[in-house]
């Protein structure tokens, strides 16, 4: 299988980022891999600008991964699309001030960070809160239109747009559902590249089967985690992948997509995976878990049906009544 295009996520503050790139070894590894960097904009500091300049001079393509402060929700969703638009404006001023070059803009589509924290601390109570939100929330179309308008605005500035999505967005789309949209504020956006975050660290059981099930339907795949990332109150950190598991996920993903993203650069450096990545034989044979993935697909289809029913309750009720009527009619004919 051919070597895919690799992109590393990096989510560090300006001081830690400057230290990571201080000796030039990380930059050398990125160049050797021909890799891109999706750089989380945790701040718009001079130190971050200096690192971007190093990457520009070395010819390493950089994506500006837009992030908010924790107080503003941290990630992009329908709840924070206005804040993300404001952050993009501030980013543009910073980029122009330091004359920096970026290949794309990344939007991380996740719920507000306090929702993630609440789901971890008290899942029962927060689930009820989200169910109430689904029932009583107004039409999210206006906010969804704002998200599409933001993407159009970014494109008009000459940037490609990447979106980083939970894999469930694929099921929502296939089910023609709006459950994730109305509960968690997660829109399905028409970006230039959608990256499904298929981190085995999220799924301790059947991780490879889940990855394979979704990867075959993806434009690009994110694997990990090798460490790093934001701390969420009440939520334990993601389990760090062993090299053997990261290698498996990379090889599996490369059989399905041409673009693979690794979370995170700092984790790979800390765990001394960079040299192994540089020397990885992409022709190494790996057997896709077809049978377990088929089981995952059945579960996904059932879940999609449930999402459709929640999103179209009247249609679902009419369908049940119709099936019941036909069934009773057939029973009468059989008895006669």
Over which residues does each language-model region extend?
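Anion (oxyanion) recognition and catalysis
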Residues: 31, 56-58, 155, 254
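Acidic-and-aromatic substrate-binding clefts and catalytic sites of carbohydrate-active enzymes
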Residues: 9-22, 37-50, 70-82, 114, ...
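Active-site groove signature of glycoside hydrolases
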Residues: 90-137, 260-262
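Substrate-binding cleft of secreted/luminal carbohydrate-active enzymes
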Residues: 6, 190-209, 213-332
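Aromatic-lined carbohydrate-recognition surfaces of secreted/lumenal glycan-active proteins
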Residues: 4-13, 63, 135-180, 195-200, ...
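An active-site-proximal structural segment forming one wall of the substrate-binding cleft
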Residues: 78-109, 183-189, 249-253
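Catalytic domains of carbohydrate-active enzymes, especially glycoside hydrolases
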Residues: 4-8, 14-46, 97-105, 187-194, ...
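Active-site-adjacent "subsite" loops/lids of carbohydrate-active enzymes
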Residues: 48-97
